[in-house]
A protein has these predicted regions:
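AMP-dependent adenylate-forming
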Residues: 21-25, 65-66, 88-115, 227-231, ...
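Gly/Ser/Thr-rich phosphate-binding loop
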Residues: 232-234, 238-244, 320-323, 337-390, ...
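Conserved ATP-binding/catalytic segment of the ANL
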Residues: 420-489
Length: 491
């Protein structure tokens, strides 16, 4: 029987993850993914309730899926209770407290490593600070931060207490005001500047210019990243570092429903953030990374796109599996993967090519281990994956179809069209923040019975899908400022 904390959360209840998959051949990965994909469509209830065991639950779900897709009435693992911070960090801090959880590559040139124990303590401090600012379950907390451990602490600190973090990429400054208005957030976490390879971005100046017209923001926590001058407003602003030092390094975990929201910033889209279901997002992100990319304990993952947009699925999925993340604040990690201990590199082809021979087609030890996924534009993991020249497969629960502008199905090698999905899957976006009618109109109404992904794809001779572009959803560009398709290389 599992031990449990006072609040019902399990202690040291880690289920084994497929660490051997890290060394699997591409053929073995492709075979496993195809087998699981077929099973997920043939017996979805049995498949998803079994795979839900990858997560620790306070109360396991009784059903996998309830609802119908026509009006976006979609619910996965509802009634089940869990906590994302426990699944991502705390359970690893119990089982392997000194294992590396985070590697921070700083622009100053040094590299700092954090263990799961240290990350649990740091995220608990962040949670205590947020509680002191009046943040409670369901509250949205907006972050506008560089790729530092503070960004990780924000994601995890919110998750501990059931709040909803919304991270706005520092290169998407024009998005910040829109996100603050859409989420009605009262708390903003930012930094004085973001030191990037092309120079320093003045984040605080951007925030100051914006907050004058946003009276709803009551508290601004400011990280002193570079020491640039910051004029704090008494009663509203405070230095985050000082608050963290004063906070306790422990904080109770709040159980959350499987359908509690997880929000993603929609990149180029002019609309509100995209809403996901918490459990389905975590499970699909982790399952895809485990089976397609072979990530598990000991993996060290670098994502060149960062963790403030749709690829926070890489963040949550890697940590659920017990791997470590490289926060590449310098932005040159693809050029020095060995120095950072990178085992898995996520990014566009150009970044992977910069990593040196072997990353695109083979690893640095000479073995071929490249995977080319088609990512969902709005987070939640991979829709399908190609494994070198061996072929590809749709991934778990995804029943894809290509359609033309009239909704006619396209099939066969060389066919091209908009990628839609014929049934709900756990990582399907649930809504748009404060605009469910817009979600239904953009993604569900044009082709009844299908979910529009916003991707244009071509079917290859081996049956795999390759992304060819984007399709506007209801006249609005799909929500992904990052490259949709890109290989995963074993560095």
């Amino acid at each position: 029987m599992r031990q449990r904390l006072a609040n019902g959360l399990p202690v040291a209840s880690l289920l084994p993850v497929s660490t051997s998959l890290v060394e699997c051949s591409l053929e073995e990965r492709l075979e496993a993914c195809r087998r699981l994909a077929v099973e997920s469509l043939a017996s979805p209830r049995r498949f998803w309730l079994r795979e839900a065991g990858l997560l620790d639950w306070v109360r396991p779900p009784d059903e996998a899926f309830v609802g119908e897709m026509k009006q976006g009435d979609v619910s996965w693992f509802s009634g089940g209770l869990l906590n994302a911070a426990w699944n991502a960090v705390d359970r690893h801090a119990v089982a392997s407290p000194e294992r590396t959880a985070l590697v921070w590559a700083r622009p100053e040139g040094d590299v700092v490593s954090w263990s799961f124990r240290e990350l649990r303590q740091a995220s608990s401090r962040m949670a205590q600070v947020l509680l002191s600012q009046g943040v409670r379950w369901g509250d949205r907390v907006v972050g506008h931060l560089p790729e530092t451990p503070t960004l990780a602490m924000l994601h995890l600190g919110c998750a501990r207490i059931g709040a909803v973090p919304v991270a706005v990429p520092v290169r998407s400054g024009g998005t910040l005001g829109r996100v603050l208005r859409a989420t009605r957030a009262r708390v903003l976490v930012t930094a004085d500047e973001a030191p990037l390879s092309e120079g320093r971005l003045p984040l605080w100046e951007r925030v100051e210019d914006l907050l004058g017209g946003l009276g709803r923001v009551e508290s601004v926590l400011v990280e002193r990243r570079t020491g640039a001058p910051v004029s704090l407003v008494y009663g509203r602003d405070q230095e985050l570092g000082t608050a963290l030092v004063r906070a306790r390094p422990t904080c109770a975990l709040r159980p959350c429903d499987g359908e509690d929201p997880l929000l993603l910033v929609p990149g180029l889209e002019d609309g509100p953030p995209v809403v996901h279901g918490l459990a389905g997002f975590l499970l699909c992100a982790a399952l895809g990374l485990r089976e397609a990319a072979g990530i598990g304990p000991g993996a060290q993952v670098l994502c060149t796109e960062g963790f403030s947009g749709p690829r926070i699925d890489v963040l949550w999925g890697t940590w659920v599996l017990g791997g470590a993340l490289v926060f590449d604040e310098r932005g040159d990690g693809a050029h020095r993967p060995r120095a950072l201990g990178v085992t898995h590199l996520f990014g566009p082809r150009g970044a992977l090519a910069a990593a040196g021979p072997g990353v695109l087609g083979a690893s640095l030890d000479g073995s071929d281990a490249s995977v080319a996924p088609v990512w969902t534009p709005e987070g939640g993991g991979m829709l399908s994956a190609r494994f070198g020249d061996l072929g590809g497969t749709s991934l778990f629960g995804v029943d894809p179809v290509l359609v033309d502008v009239m909704g006619r199905r396209a099939a066969g090698a060389g066919s091209e069209g908009e990628l839609c999905v014929k049934r709900s899957w756990p990582a399907q976006p649930r809504s748009l923040e404060q605009d469910h009618a817009g979600y239904v109109a953009q993604r569900l109404e044009r082709f009844p019975g299908l979910y529009r992904t916003g991707l244009r794809c071509r079917q290859l001779a081996d049956g795999a899908l390759a992304t060819t572009g984007l399709t506007p959803l209801g006249g609005v560009a799909p929500s992904n400022v990052f490259p949709i398709e890109g290989p995963i290389g074993r560095a």
